[in-house]
Design a protein with these regions (language model features):
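Residue-level recognition of short, solvent-exposed, well-ordered loop/turn junctions
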Residues: 23-24, 77, 177, 247, ...
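Glycine-rich cofactor phosphate-binding loops and adjacent beta1-alpha1 units
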Residues: 174, 217, 222-333
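Residues in the short beta-alpha loop(s) of Rossmann-like NAD(P)-binding domains
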Residues: 212, 315, 340
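Rossmann-fold dehydrogenase core element
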Residues: 305-312, 322-362
């Protein structure tokens, strides 16, 4: 089959690799029909090379049609249309029973001290082959796949793999009061969808912050009040307080996370890590840190006293101290974590209808063949061509 593989920093290629076989009796094989490029894929593309091997298959936002089932699979049959969550969860352990599928005790990567395995996401999370490929082996075939109806385009359902549950959980964790206010930092796919979900769930004011004109324009179209970071810079806090009676918003969603691109200090750290052998680089990334907390520091400034910060952006080890004194003084609540995809499916599926309240049918800015994946990664990295969300079609 053809698959997009990691080869080195800013070097991904579409190669011919062996088709995945059934390995366990509850496995299924899915023929991929659409697969997204996620912002966290850029962390692999640029920063997390020490945790990758050349040839690793990337991608964790796939959907498709069941091609083959193992002998103990009864939950799906050949020909079923399914979306595959990005976290690999068994559905039966204590953590899955608590709705914490991202902490699945069956697939936790204990030797790394991390949570549930993830498709296409490094040795930190199990080194499971990803979904930017023609076929994908999916374990736990009776529990993990999300069955969706045939008929509507893939655009209707593919974001159940990551974007929708991640954005939904971000809003859930933000705990915005009815008619309340929230600032969304970063209007990439997760931030843009979180802004839409917050408005759909009754927020009275959603402030979106970014510095990419296309992202700001798109969020404005869906009802967000947008602030261009290029204009406000260090005065962003004053601008937000001006819109909220001097208090700041009830909540802030940090949809930025690790500064994988753009920060000179972070860039220098990334370069230094890239010069080290993998074992030393891993240790540096896990202890000294390879990113900055600029977005989180901004969130602490923007949120009102007694408010909530919800972190959905991925961080890779902090190089800045946490502003604990300020957070304590302002009585800020902080919630974060990988999305528990399966937990939110019942909330999300009823919204994926023809009236399309969240705008999923037109959410992708680019649809490209899998063979164009390497160029798509670079375009996404440079924020060129208006690229916000790309679906690759194998």
């Amino acid at each position: 089959m053809r698959a997009l593989t990691y080869q080195g920093k800013r070097d991904v290629r579409v190669d011919t690799v062996p088709d995945p076989p059934i390995q366990d009796p509850t496995d299924i094989i899915v023929k991929i029909t659409s697969t997204g490029i996620c912002g966290s894929d850029l962390h692999l593309y640029e920063v997390l090379g020490p945790y990758l091997d050349p040839g690793d298959i990337l991608g964790h936002e796939p959907m498709g049609v069941v091609e083959e089932v193992g002998p103990e699979v009864t939950g799906v049959v050949q020909g079923d249309r399914v979306v595959i969550p990005f976290n690999v969860s068994c559905g039966h352990c204590h953590m899955c029973g608590q709705g914490l599928h991202s902490q699945c005790e069956t697939t936790q990567v204990r030797e790394r001290g991390t949570g549930a395995s993830l498709f296409g996401f490094t040795k930190l999370y199990g080194q499971v082959p990803g979904g930017q490929a023609e076929y994908l082996r999916v374990p736990f075939g009776n529990d993990l796949p999300i069955k969706v109806p045939h008929g509507p385009s893939d655009d209707r359902f593919v974001y159940l793999s990551d974007v929708l549950p991640t954005a939904w959980q971000a809003v859930e964790y933000a705990d915005i009061p009815p008619g309340g206010s929230v600032t969304v930092l970063g209007l990439g796919p997760i931030g843009a969808m979180a802004a839409r979900i917050a408005l759909h769930r009754g927020a009275g004011l959603v402030i979106g912050v970014d510095l990419v004109p296309e992202r700001l324009d798109r969020a404005s179209t869906y009802g967000a009040t947008c602030l261009d970071l290029r204009r406000y810079g260090k005065n962003l806090g004053d601008a937000v307080r001006d819109l909220t009676d001097g208090r700041g918003t009830d909540a802030v969603i940090d949809a930025v996370g690790m500064e994988a691109h753009g920060s000179p200090v972070a860039k220098a750290a990334h370069t230094a890590v890239g010069l080290l052998p993998d074992a030393l680089a891993q240790r540096m990334m896990e202890t000294a840190g390879i990113d900055r907390l600029a977005a989180l520091h901004a969130a602490v400034d923007l949120v009102r006293r007694g408010g909530t910060i919800s972190v959905s952006g991925v961080y890779g080890g902090s190089a800045d101290p946490m502003p604990m004194l300020t957070m304590f003084d302002k009585q800020i609540q902080l919630r974060m974590g990988q999305a528990n995809v399966k937990r939110w499916v019942d909330d999300l599926l009823p919204l994926l209808t023809d009236d399309d309240p969240l705008g999923v049918d037109s959410f992708a800015t680019h649809h490209l063949p899998l063979e164009a994946g390497p160029q798509a990664y670079e375009t996404f990295r440079t924020k060129a061509d208006g690229m916000i969300k790309t679906l690759l079609i194998p």
